[in-house]
Design a protein with these regions (language model features):
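N-terminal secretory signal peptides and thylakoid transit peptides that target proteins
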Residues: 1-15
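Intrinsically disordered, low-complexity regions enriched in Ser/Pro/Gly/Gln/His and often acidic
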Residues: 10-12, 35, 59, 115
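C-terminal segment of N-terminal export signals and the immediately downstream linker at the start
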Residues: 18-64, 68-69
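A short Gly-Trp-Pro
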Residues: 46, 53, 58-61, 67, ...
Length: 188
C-alpha cells in the first residue's frame, strides 16, 4: 500500500523533473544578480571577430531608402509598427547560442540566454541588452501597452508585458521578422 507521504513525494519529484527538463524553465536566472550578469556579459555569445554597431551610432534613412533596405514585411513592422501573425517566425525555435540583432541596423538587442518560450507564438525574452530600446505608450488596442523601438534606427520591435518569468516578470514580445540571429559559431 502506498502511503500518503510516498505519494506526495512522488508527485513532487515528478513535478520538479518536469519543470527542470522543460527548456522554457530550465535556464531561467534565479535572481536579478543573474540577469545583470547576462546583461553585462552578452558579448560572450558573439562569434569571434563579429563587429556590431553601437547604440550611439544613429542610423537615419529616408522612407524610400528603408523600402530599399527592407523587404515589405520587415518595412511594415519596423517602419509602420505592424505585427506579424503569431507562430510564423522561424526564430521561435532558435535555440543555438548567439545574439539577436535588429534586422534594420544590426544593433545587438538580445542574447539566446535571454530568450524563453512564452507560448505566445512570438520570440520572447525576459530581459534585453541594456540601453538598446526606447519605449512609448501604444493605444492601438484602446488599452495602453508599452511598445519598444530600436534606439539606433527607431525600428518597431514589439511590446513589453508584465507577465514574464521571474525574476524580471517581463516579457519582451518581439516580432521575429524584425530580428536577425547571429550564432556564436558563425559570423556577422
Amino acid at each position: 500500500m502506498i502511503t500518503r507521504r510516498a505519494l506526495l513525494q512522488s508527485v513532487f519529484a515528478s513535478a520538479i523533473w518536469t519543470l527542470f527538463k522543460n527548456p522554457a524553465f530550465a535556464a531561467q536566472p534565479a535572481s536579478m544578480k543573474d540577469v545583470e550578469a547576462l546583461q553585462k556579459n552578452w558579448k560572450l555569445l558573439l562569434a569571434d571577430g563579429t563587429k556590431l554597431p553601437l547604440p550611439s551610432e544613429p542610423l537615419k534613412l529616408s522612407k524610400e531608402d528603408w523600402r530599399k533596405r527592407l523587404n515589405p514585411t520587415q518595412f511594415n513592422i519596423l517602419r509602420e509598427e505592424g505585427t506579424e501573425p503569431p507562430g510564423t517566425s522561424a526564430l521561435n525555435n532558435e535555440k543555438r547560442p548567439g545574439v539577436f540583432v535588429c534586422v534594420g541596423c544590426n544593433l545587438a538587442l538580445f542574447t539566446s540566454d535571454m530568450k524563453y518560450d512564452s507560448g505566445t507564438g512570438w520570440p520572447s525574452f525576459f530581459t534585453t541588452i541594456p540601453g538598446v530600446f526606447a519605449n512609448k505608450t501604444d493605444y492601438k488596442l484602446i488599452l495602453p501597452r508599452s511598445e519598444y523601438h530600436c534606439i539606433r534606427c527607431g525600428g518597431h520591435h514589439g511590446h513589453v508585458f508584465d507577465d514574464g518569468p521571474p525574476p524580471t516578470g517581463k516579457r519582451w514580445c518581439n516580432n521575429g521578422v524584425a530580428l536577425k540571429f547571429i550564432p556564436k559559431s558563425g559570423s556577422a
